[in-house]
Each structure stands twice: as C-alpha cells, then as structure tokens.
C-alpha cells in the first residue's frame, strides 16, 4: 500500500526551484524508506508511491539549504494509502542590524567644541550606498535590518563638528555563514580623527 507526499516550498526572495528534500523513516511493513525529491519551478517536490508509514510518521528535511537562509526545522508526515499528504517549508533570509559607536581616537570622548553627534555614515552594499544614518549625542546609531551578505560596509560621509573625515571603509562582518538564525546584531567601534591628529 502506498501514498504520496507533496512538499510546497516558499522563500522570502522567491527562489523555490531546485531545492532538494529527503523523506526517511520506517514503513508500516518495517521497510526502511530513504527518498529524495527536488522542487520544480513552482516550488513543489513530489514523493510518489511511498510505502505507507507505521505508527511513527516519516521525517522530511531540506537538504543543502542555501547559506543565505535559516535552515528550516525538520517536519514529520504520515503517508496514508491513496492519499496525498502536504507539508510546507519556508526559507527565511538571515538578516543583520549593526550598532555603530563613534569615539574620539585620542581620548575616547569629544574634546573642546567637538561633538560625536551629527556624523553622517552610509551603509553600502558593494559600492552602492543603501542608507544613511546620523550619530546621536552618544555617537551611536543602529541600522534597520538588511539581508546578510559578504559585501556590506560602513563609511563615514560627513564628520561631526570638530572631527576630520575618516575615509576608512569598515567591513560589517555580516557574512551569512556566520549566522544560523533570522535576526542578528553586530557592533562596530568607529574611532574618529580630530584635527590635532593631523
């Protein structure tokens, strides 16, 4: 006796074709089942003519999840005679936000008329400016969330009062392989040169 399993794949960035799923467990007859199916252009993977499951349902897992996604949890599914069981899997993109703290390179805190507030920074994807942020009175800002990738950087665009422009390009360190969950936070300490440094 056999049945079918349909896995429906979705993702935040709509990449659903070519994803491999594994179905494994022990059938009602005591036979080990270990099968693979790949999603089509619509994100559907079909396991056909699978031996019906026993009291313990089969396990379904996504295989070789792309590094940009959080690995979805395994699911279980019973296979019943002449029925189609459906399970849905969603890929969630790994995201990051960064808190940047600007400080005085020499003293740590601003000297004289200098201030850490009002410096304008850009967050760049490759060479493209994506957003601008302005430091608060504590010399800080926190970005919104962005999708993890290897080429995010922070650059100072306009220094705050009493400081020179720091032209250093700082890598964010938001490579997707560093993370396993959806929401990730990272920090960057930015020391700024004052005119007395030159």
Stretch-by-stretch model annotation:
Residues 1-192:
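Solvent-exposed loop/turn and edge beta-strand elements of beta-rich ligand-binding domains
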Residues 193-198:
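A short, hydrophobic C-terminal helix/tail in secreted or cell-surface proteins
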């Amino acid at each position: 006796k056999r049945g079918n399993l349909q896995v429906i794949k979705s993702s935040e960035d709509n990449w659903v074709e070519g994803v491999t799923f594994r179905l494994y467990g022990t059938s009602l007859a005591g036979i080990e089942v270990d099968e693979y199916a790949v999603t089509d252009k619509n994100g559907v993977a079909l396991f056909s003519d699978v031996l019906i499951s026993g009291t313990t349902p089969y396990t379904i897992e996504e295989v070789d999840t792309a590094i940009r996604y959080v690995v979805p949890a395994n699911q279980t599914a019973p296979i019943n005679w002449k029925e189609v069981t459906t399970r849905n899997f969603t890929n969630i993109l790994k995201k990051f936000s960064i808190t940047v703290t600007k400080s005085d390179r020499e003293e740590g805190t601003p000297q004289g008329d200098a201030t850490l507030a009002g410096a304008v920074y850009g967050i760049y994807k490759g060479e493209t400016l994506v957003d601008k942020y302005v430091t608060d009175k504590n010399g800080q800002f926190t970005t919104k969330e962005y999708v993890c990738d290897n080429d995010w950087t922070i650059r100072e665009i306009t220094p705050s009062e009493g400081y020179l422009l720091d032209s250093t390009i700082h890598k964010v360190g938001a490579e997707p392989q560093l993370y396993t969950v959806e929401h990730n936070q990272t920090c960057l300490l930015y020391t700024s040169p004052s005119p007395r440094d030159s």
